[in-house]
Structure formats: C-alpha cells, structure tokens
Amino acid sequence: MDTAISAKELTKWFGEGDLRTYAVKEVSFDAYFGEILFVVGPSGSGKTTLLSMISGILRPDSGTVNVDHVDIWSLTPDQIAEFRLNKVGFVFQDYHLFPRLTTAENVAIPLILKKKDWNESIRDAEHYLDVVGLKNKAQLAPVKLSGGEQQRVAIARALVAQPDLLIFDEPTASLDGDTGRRIMEFVKNRILNDSRCILIVTHDSRIFEYADRIMRMEDGKTVGIEKRADH
C-alpha cells in the first residue's frame, strides 16, 4: 500500500524551562492509503495533539510529517490552509453542525469556503447526503435529526471535498453501542477505499474490531502498533 502519512520524531511541548511539559514526544509512524488506523490511549496521552499536528492545525516543535509525500510544515500558512481544505476531512465528537442552516447547507460549507458556486455546492452536498443515506433529510434543520444521523451529516460534510485523509475524533463517544457500530460499519464498507486513509482517535473498545491497525499511546509516546489478527 502507498504511504499516506509518514511522521518522524514528532514532538510538541507546552511551557518552557522547568515548566516544559511534553504532550507528544518523538512519535514516528506510517499510515497507508486503504487502511483504518486507530489511535488509542488514556486521556492526556497525546492522541488529539498528534492528530492536530498531522492535519496542519498545530505546528510541531520538532519532527516532520508528510501527508501524501508533502512535508506539510514546510508550507506557507496559506498553503497549509489550502491543504486542510482540500486534503483533510474532519469529523468531530460533537459534530459542529450549524442550527440555523439546513442539513444540506451544513454539508456544503467546505465547498462554499472554496468559493464554489452555491447551487453546485448544494447539489454536491445532496449527493453526499445520499451516500450516507440521508438525502431525504437535506432540507431539515440538524435539531430534527437523531445523534446517529447528525454523525452521518458530519461524515458527509467531511467527504464533500473528496479528501485523501479522514480524521475522526471520538466518533462514537456520544452514541449508544448499536448506533456506534452502524456508523463504523458504514465507514468501513462505504467510505474507506484504496485512495483514502482514515485515522480514528477513540477510547471505545467496542469498535476496535473495525481497525486495520491500532496504535497505542501513553504519556505522549507510542507504546506499540498492532495489526488486528483478522485483517
């Protein structure tokens, strides 16, 4: 498989001198197109900080990260913003849906930010709502949707710009077990493909079965990457 992410000695600290605290320390790993990589570990182990550096949100203090063979932190701020808009899709735990917009308008936001025509953006949004099984909910406000449906709207919004890298932060934390498994079945069977890499931060051991590999973190360091036996 082609390498989607190559992180080398990634390090991030906060504070200086005797007050310096390492959030992530010398983390190196590769992730590949066509796989789902879980990043797991206790709260405060550096998982979200690591993904923030990989996705161009938080600059590392040392180390490098290449996404699709591009050293993202060698780019200018404008280039990094363009990289995030075109290459990375985010699905957050609390969805971040705008209550005053329709479901379709929420999904269209990344395209509007890219200055795409409004009507084309809405058509594309409706297509991806269809992909996640919610085209008939396109004109509803998010408050009219269930938690699982809102999560699928967030997935559609992450997909609409056709990113190479999808990042999920605790995607099932606020969902019941059955809904969480349905979301992961959907991600595994409908969203993953050979030209896309999916990274998922989670505490939810109920969904570990959907990972191709699991990277474990403790105290800002990786303590192992394991391939699931049935993959």
What are these regions (language model features)?
Residues 4-5, 10-210, 214-217:
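ABC family nucleotide-binding domain
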Residues 214-226:
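H-loop (His-switch) and adjacent beta-strand-loop-beta switch element
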Residues 1-13, 224-231:
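ABC-family P-loop ATPase nucleotide-binding domain
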